[in-house]
């Protein structure tokens, strides 16, 4: 997943990543994980959580390069 796709996914889920610090982004990710994780009875299931995790990894790499 490239950075543009990752940012688009998080924006669709209501998180405006460019305006967040790394810590704020982590908190936003954990809120999404609680909401969309398939073990919590979410019907969106495994694929959405896998995409969220891939997007998170891509965005965290960008945060690390930036700092």
Summary of predicted features, one role per range:
Residues 1-43, 51-66:
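N-terminal J-domain/J-like co-chaperone modules of DnaJ/Hsp40 proteins
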Residues 46:
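Short, well-ordered alpha-helical segments
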């Amino acid at each position: 997943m490239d950075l543009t796709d990752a940012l688009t996914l998080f924006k669709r889920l209501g998180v405006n990543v460019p305006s967040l610090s790394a810590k704020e982004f982590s908190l936003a990710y954990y809120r999404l994980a609680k909401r969309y994780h398939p073990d919590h009875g979410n019907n969106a299931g495994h694929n959405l959580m896998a995409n969220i995790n891939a997007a998170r990894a891509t965005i965290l790499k960008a945060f690390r390069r930036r700092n």
